[in-house]
Amino acid sequence: MNVGIIGFQGDVEEHIAIVKKISRRRKGINVLRIRRKEDLDRSDSLIIPGGESTTIYKLISEYGIYDEIIRRAKEGMPVMATCAGLILISKDTNDDRVPGMNLLDVTIMRNAYGRQVNSFETDIDIKGIGTFHAVFIRAPRIKEYGNVDVMASLDGYPVMVRSGNILGMTFHPELTGDVSIHEYFLSMGGGGYISTATG
């Protein structure tokens, strides 16, 4: 199973480290840093990391990856998007500089929790996973949502949602060392991986 991670900007190394941590226990998992369309072609599933959404959008568009992500996702490739990644895959980004891929029926408000100094950590309860210590850094907020499964909420707003093969969250699961969300994502398909996560 080849797990692709968009590798231009943001928490790329942190996601790579988490997937490699899982691969040490479960054979057959490889990590690919996606910088070209050809890299995406070799991927069974995809992680779009947090970072700066306008920068990531510009680069994946320039390298022909943006439209390819949409095509592969609509064909069923599992996609996990965190923070800025969630902005990119949303239906409405509320930012003309970053057109959403419309892979998740959510409307986003960027940097809703404030600036870097307003970042915070808190425990959340995730359906099917359990308690998770979530790190929110200049996090977006899901203002509105349609046909998605809300897996976790905070202060009345969804912070993790799923629709079929698409998983999105406003926080950074790669910054905690806890592999449970990545385990859950890998169990969604794309290469026959079976999760051993217990929550």
Curated annotation (Swiss-Prot):
Its EC number is 4.3.3.6, 3.5.1.2. It comes from the Archaea. Keywords: Glutamine amidotransferase, Hydrolase, Lyase, Pyridoxal phosphate. It catalyses: aldehydo-D-ribose 5-phosphate + D-glyceraldehyde 3-phosphate + L-glutamine = pyridoxal 5'-phosphate + L-glutamate + phosphate + 3 H2O + H(+); L-glutamine + H2O = L-glutamate + NH4(+). InterPro entries: Class_I_gatase-like, PdxT/SNO, PdxT/SNO_CS. One of its GO terms (biological process) is pyridoxine metabolic process. Pathway: Cofactor biosynthesis; pyridoxal 5'-phosphate biosynthesis. GO terms for cellular component: cytosol; glutaminase complex. One of its GO terms (molecular function) is glutaminase activity. L-glutamine binds at G51, E52, S53, R110, I137, R138. Gene3D superfamilies: 3.40.50.880. The active site is at C83 (nucleophile), H172 (charge relay system), E174 (charge relay system). The keyword Cell inner membrane does not apply. In the presence of PdxS, forms a dodecamer of heterodimers. Only shows activity in the heterodimer. HAMAP family: PdxT (MF_01615). Catalyzes the hydrolysis of glutamine to glutamate and ammonia as part of the biosynthesis of pyridoxal 5'-phosphate. The resulting ammonia molecule is channeled to the active site of PdxS. Belongs to the glutaminase PdxT/SNO family. This is Pyridoxal 5'-phosphate synthase subunit PdxT. It comes from Thermoplasma volcanium (strain ATCC 51530 / DSM 4299 / JCM 9571 / NBRC 15438 / GSS1). The gene is pdxT.
